[in-house]
């Protein structure tokens, strides 16, 4: 176990002891997941390189970035995420639909049927990917967390966030995503974070106020 994961474990134990309903918040900026095949098309002969580990132990931000090219505009220097995925996927904020000129739906990761396509450009090549979404807010959690909250995969939760400057916000329909290797963390995008005045650091928390909604 490396130092960062040890710190995460210590923070988790302390938090769950003091307030078991608190959930760390991770703010997801726009990013791209690629299959190994699509990565090789964009970065021939290269390997995806780790820039920074993320809270979910298998995931990392890569050194490589790409540009997203839509019918109306371009978003440059969009970070790739590793490891490789079985399907390529682009995640943006809702407001970035207007920049790009597309209409990406709010979906869970991997739910790509009927999603728009977009051109993805690297310094070496350009490809078109079908699979642009606005990620639906969700909570990664271990199986033990799910048992503690009384939820299962796909259940809807409600989380209260005390943003800076008195911007208390209640996020409804937060999807539970339990898995054995997941670490407790709520994911929201930059639009949602801005609305609640939540920072991009690792010190923001939400409080689960309704553990399960039918």
Curated annotation (Swiss-Prot):
Classification via InterPro entries: PTAC
Binding site for Zn(2+) 2: 138, 140, 187
Chief site of localization: other
Pathway: Polyol metabolism; 1,2-propanediol degradation
Catalytic activity: propanoyl-CoA + phosphate = propanoyl phosphate + CoA
Residues that, per the record, bind CoA: 27-29, 72, 79, 98, 194
Record note on cofactor: There are 2 Zn(2+) ions per monomer; Zn(2+) and CoA bind inbetween the 2 domains in each monomer.
Required co-factors: Zn(2+)
Keywords on record: Acyltransferase, Bacterial microcompartment, Metal-binding, Transferase, Zinc
A Gene Ontology molecular function term of the record: metal ion binding
A Gene Ontology BP annotation from the UniProt entry: propanediol catabolic process
Entry binding sites for Zn(2+) 1: 31, 33, 91
Keyword Ion transport: no
Disulfide bridge positions per record: none
Domain notes from UniProt: Formed by 2 beta-barrels, each is capped on both ends by short alpha-helices.
Family: Belongs to the PduL family.
Function description: Involved in 1,2-propanediol (1,2-PD) utilization within the bacterial microcompartment (BMC) dedicated to 1,2-PD degradation by catalyzing the conversion of propanoyl-CoA to propanoyl-phosphate.
Protein name in the entry: Phosphate propanoyltransferase
Naturally occurring in which organism (per UniProt): Limosilactobacillus reuteri (strain DSM 20016)
């Amino acid at each position: 176990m490396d130092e960062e994961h040890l710190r995460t474990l210590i923070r988790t134990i302390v938090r769950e002891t003091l307030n078991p309903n608190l959930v760390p918040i991770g703010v997801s900026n726009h990013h791209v997941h690629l299959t190994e095949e699509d990565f090789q098309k964009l970065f021939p002969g290269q390997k995806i390189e780790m820039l920074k580990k993320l809270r979910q132990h298998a995931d990392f931000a890569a050194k490589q970035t790409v540009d997203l090219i839509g019918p109306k505009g371009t978003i440059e220097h969009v970070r790739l995420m590793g490891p490789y995925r079985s399907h390529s996927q682009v995640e943006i904020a809702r407001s970035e639909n207007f920049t790009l000129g597309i209409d990406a739906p709010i979906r869970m990761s991997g739910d790509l049927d009927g999603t728009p396509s977009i051109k993805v450009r690297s310094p070496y090549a350009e490809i078109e990917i079908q699979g642009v979404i606005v990620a639906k807010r969700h909570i990664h959690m271990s199986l033990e967390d799910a048992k503690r909250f009384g939820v299962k995969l796909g259940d809807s939760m409600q989380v209260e966030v005390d943003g800076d400057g008195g911007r208390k916000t209640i996020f409804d329909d937060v999807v539970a995503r339990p898995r054995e290797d997941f670490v407790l963390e709520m994911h929201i995008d930059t639009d949602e974070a801005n609305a609640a005045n939540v920072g991009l650091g690792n010190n923001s928390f939400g409080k689960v106020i309704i553990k399960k909604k039918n």
